[in-house]
Swiss-Prot record:
Keyword Glycoprotein: yes
UniProt-recorded name of the protein: Growth hormone-releasing hormone receptor
Residues that span the membrane, as ranges: 131-151, 168-188, 211-231, 241-261, 284-304, 332-352, 358-378
Single GO term (MF): growth hormone-releasing hormone receptor activity
Illness: Little (lit) mice exhibits anterior pituitary hypoplasia.
Role, per record: Receptor for GRF, coupled to G proteins which activate adenylyl cyclase. Stimulates somatotroph cell growth, growth hormone gene transcription and growth hormone secretion.
Keywords: Cell membrane, Disease variant, Disulfide bond, G-protein coupled receptor, Glycoprotein, Membrane, Receptor, Signal, Transducer, Transmembrane, Transmembrane helix
Length: 423
């Protein structure tokens, strides 16, 4: 069996099994490598003008055989792609005879085998991951929609901090929806057309996916910034600029994503814009994300330092310290929960740690929206109190239309005063 026939059979096997590696089908890696190798082989053949050699350079569909003199033989290793299936990749030998190149020996299926049982195992593994992240995103969308409805419907919960919560909820909904849109646009079936598609829908889905990811990180950062400003406020007039956070939280991701789209259109308008992990344009997206994760972690440490000072017995009564802790505990949980593993992975190559990265980012990451809704809404004491009042039939007209702000004053020697909402 020659290289072209074996390559075609491998593609059929990969497409049949639907194996996925990372965010791409495994057959896309195979097709990409074959195209690159074929192009390099043809370019090398064009630069060789020596017609005295017995066998000219040729591409057999899988390997590039260099020009060789009559009576000589060449041995080449199997393509690098086969290392996905094990470390024991063999060599293929061909002789240059008077009549031309001999058949490969040993045959490609023997020298470069593809174990079907391994493909079946990988199919089962990634199918399970897909079921998990589809379920996780679906649960997250439902929980986040309910949480937004609660915070919007209960007027006593209207305050800047809860407004920021709703923005964060919206970014998780956008992120989950972008995953479904991208899957529908790129992986529509078992064919390999998605490996080379260049449709507008495909590119738009990738752009929306990047925008959703960036807005998600920006509003997680906004939560930390707002809490830091709130805890460090030294005057009733030093309120955080909420609308500046709104502008930055949505505007900067739109600006970065728009710049990335312009870069792709100008310099790399090929295929679906999804194969760009080594592209300079990719840092327009990845750079701000890495920066936001680093800043968020710094704010996390700063918030801890502020709380340690404010929770000292000399800095206020038991009620005041309880208010500070209740205000901060959700954000203190979320920042390390959603940031530490990104700090680790952002400084590793994109191909490193796939066995950990895939289930962590696609599987567990799909439940982040649900966790946010639980911490910021369903377990929030004020939210539960308001729902109880509505549920047990208290007349909402007898209650204030809006929650009043509470002024917390520390002992005179500290000369610190904090003006904030309890929610």
């Amino acid at each position: 069996m020659d290289g072209l026939m074996w390559a075609t059979r491998i593609l059929c096997l990969l497409s049949l099994c639907g194996v996925t590696l990372g965010h791409l089908h495994l057959e896309c890696d195979f097709i990409t490598q074959l195209r690159d190798d074929e192009l390099a082989c043809l370019q090398a053949a064009e630069g060789t003008n020596n017609t005295s050699l017995g066998c000219p350079g040729t591409w057999d569909g899988l390997l590039c055989w260099p020009p060789t003199g009559s009576g000589q033989w060449v041995s080449l290793p199997c393509p690098e792609f086969f290392s996905h299936f094990g470390s024991d990749t063999g060599f293929v030998k061909r002789d240059c005879t008077i009549t031309g190149w001999s058949n490969p020996f040993p045959p490609y299926p023997v020298a470069c085998p593809v174990p079907l049982e391994l493909l079946t195992k990988e199919k089962s593994y990634f199918s399970t991951v897909k079921i998990i992240y589809t379920t996780g995103h679906s649960i997250s969308i439902v929980a986040l929609c309910v949480a937004i409805a609660i915070l919007v419907a209960l007027r006593r919960l209207h305050c800047p901090r809860n407004y920021i919560h709703t923005q964060l909820f919206a970014t998780f909904i956008l992120k989950a929806s972008a995953v479904f849109l991208k899957d529908a646009a790129i992986f529509q079936g078992d064919s390999t057309d998605h490996c080379s598609m260049s449709t507008v829908l495909c590119k738009v889905s990738v752009a929306i996916s990047h925008l959703a990811t960036m807005t998600n990180f920006s509003w997680l950062l906004a939560e930390a910034v707002y809490l830091s400003c709130l805890l460090a406020s030294t005057s009733p007039r030093s309120k955080p600029a909420f609308w500046w956070l709104v502008l930055a939280g949505w505007g900067l991701p739109v600006l970065c994503t728009g710049t990335w789209v312009g870069c792709k259109l100008a310099f790399e308008d090929t295929e679906c814009w999804d194969l760009d992990n080594s592209s300079p344009c990719w840092w327009i997206i990845k750079g701000p994300i890495v920066l936001s994760v680093g800043v968020n972690f710094g704010l996390f440490l700063n918030i801890i330092c502020i709380l340690l000072r404010k929770l000292e017995p000399a800095q206020g009564g038991l009620h005041t310290r309880a208010q500070y802790w209740r205000l901060s505990k959700s954000t203190l949980l979320l920042i390390p929960l959603f940031g530490i593993h990104y700090i680790i992975f952002n400084f590793l190559p994109d191909s490193a740690g796939l066995d950990i990265r895939v289930p962590l980012e696609l599987g567990l990451g799909s439940f982040q929206g649900f966790i946010v809704a639980v911490l910021y809404c369903f377990l929030n004491q004020e939210v539960r109190t308001e729902i109880s009042r509505k549920w047990y039939g208290h007349d909402p007209e007898l209650l204030p239309a809006r929650r009043t702000c509470t002024e917390w004053t520390t002992p005179p020697r500290s000369r610190l005063k904090v003006l904030t909402s309890e929610c």
